[in-house]
Amino acid sequence: MYLSAQAIEALEGVRKVHLLDAKAVRINKSLGDAVGMTQLGIHQISVPPGHFSTEFHCHRYEEEAIYVLSGSGVATIGDCKQPIGPGDFIGCPINGVAHEMYNDGDEPLVCLVVGQRLAQDVSDYPRLGKRLYRNSGEWSLVDHADIEHVAR
């Protein structure tokens, strides 16, 4: 399927606020949904100035990739803070380090974000000491301290 630049511009963006961080706000245009894709999430996101893209997190099963289209910001990748701008790329492999982006500019930070759409995933939020289990549409959030690791 094909989407023209004009069709993408005309798509209505959905404002999303992260469930764990009210400062993590983005406008999401799901390009993949618009053409019927089900296995990959492909989104154009716009992060307003002074906001984060998401809560600092990492995925245990889904890979994620980010390509900066316009604007500027700072990506936190593990312990590193990296200035980002148009043409920069961030790859987030499974079991990688936690990551987030912050828009420190005065215009929207616009990125193309691509990620898998598995039925199950586990995301860790290390700053909050939380883990999110996602299983076929059901989401369960737990404190890291409450996770009992069982030896096999």
Identify what each model region corresponds to.
Residues 25-30, 43-59, 94-95:
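Conserved short histidine dyad/triad with adjacent acidic residue
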Residues 36, 94-121:
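Ligand-binding loop in jelly-roll beta-barrel domains
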Residues 44-48, 58-76, 114-118:
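Short, conserved beta-strand element in jelly-roll/cupin
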